[in-house]
From Swiss-Prot:
This is NADH-quinone oxidoreductase subunit H 2. It comes from Rhodopseudomonas palustris (strain HaA2). The keyword Phosphoprotein does not apply. The keyword Translocase applies. Belongs to the complex I subunit 1 family.
Length: 341
């Protein structure tokens, strides 16, 4: 009996415990990232932002969470109730499940699989189903239009993100996220990370990640001036909160992906003491926050694109550019003898 427990049940209990701990830490982090997003936006507009609940407004996100939970969920009379309530849950669960393969430090990962990048790309692609379900089940024209926009937008920019991943794959020879970080470990520190040799792809990834997560200036799915609140028009209370939570988890996931692919993951910027004394998870968190700051600044200073401009940028600019970079990177690696063995 003891052997059965140690062989079969104990690994399962460990994985469940790791997953619960990761989700709790991630949700608490999301609360403060949401607050930081509002504070950055306020600072750009020369105002103070949330500053009432808690010291310096640090508890504002938790107050908003409590308010949302205590509200009554309103369901439109013509809505498909089951699909309507399932949509935000699908969006949130898919966003959280991507973190199962993301290493936050050396050995700090729930599932260190060899197709980690492919897994994250697949899970992020599936998140569009939550938006489509919400748009269709609401029985309203604004959410339905937003769902159609979301499907087209995500498909358009996932192609570019796929080519970005192929460029990194050519340099590393593996889709394992830990291997990608270790491949950037060199005596050059920050200059040895892939953001420098693959800078055009870093820019393509950054802009495509904005579009993939429906962030400004590509928030056509939630364009207030056109679609009121987009696919969330009919949502309130806890379902609305789950959509917001899923959106910000997806944003942080993309920031973590950018950190791993281009910014060296948990590696220190200078591979010498005292920088090497700092735990890897601290460097990883700082780099994710830097990526999120870039996301927040785009929201604050860049005007929204028109829908036709969004599609043109994805198909006529990023797709040819990323495809050309794949060819160039492959050629340079082959003829310079730098291809991974």
């Amino acid at each position: 009996m003891a052997d059965f427990f140690m062989t079969n049940l104990w690994p399962l209990i460990v994985v469940i415990g790791q997953s619960v701990l990761l989700i709790v830490v991630l949700l608490i982090s999301i609360a403060y990232i949401l607050l930081a997003d509002r504070k950055i936006w306020a600072a750009v507009q020369i105002r103070r932002g949330p500053n009432v609940v808690g010291p310096w407004g640090l508890l504002q996100s938790f107050a908003d969470l409590l308010k949302m939970i205590l509200k009554e969920p309103m369901i439109p009379s013509g809505a498909n109730k089951g699909v309507f309530l399932l949509a935000p849950l699908v969006t949130c669960v898919l966003a959280l499940s991507a973190w199962a393969v993301i290493p936050v430090s050396a050995g700090w990962v729930i599932a260190d699989i060899n197709v980690g990048v492919l897994y994250i790309l697949a899970v992020s692609s599936l998140s569009v189903y939550g938006i489509i379900m919400a748009g269709w089940s609401s029985n309203s024209k604004y959410p339905f239009l937003a769902a159609l926009r979301s499907a087209a937008q995500m498909v358009s920019y996932e192609v570019s993100i796929g080519f970005v991943i192929i460029c990194v794959l050519l340099c590393v020879g593996s889709l394992n996220l830990t291997a990608i970080v270790q491949a950037q470990n060199s005596q050059w520190g920050v200059l040895g990370w892939y953001w420098l040799p693959l800078f055009p792809m870093f820019v393509v990834f950054y802009v495509s990640a904005l579009a993939e997560t429906n962030r400004p200036p590509f928030d056509l799915v939630e364009a207030e001036s056109e679609l009121v609140a987009g696919f969330m028009v009919e949502y309130s209370s806890t379902p609305y909160m789950l959509f917001v939570l899923g959106e910000y988890v997806a944003i942080v996931t993309m920031c973590a992906m950018g950190t791993i692919l281009f910014l060296g993951g948990w590696l220190p910027p200078v591979p010498y003491a005292p920088f090497t004394w700092v735990p890897g998870i601290v460097w990883f968190a700082l780099k994710v926050l830097f990526m999120f700051f870039m996301f927040a600044m785009a929201k604050a200073i860049v005007p929204r694109y028109r829908y036709d401009q969004l599609m043109r940028l994805g198909w006529k600019v990023f797709l040819p550019l990323s495809l050309a970079m794949v060819v160039i990177v492959a050629a340079v690696l082959q003829f310079a003898g730098l291809a991974p063995k």
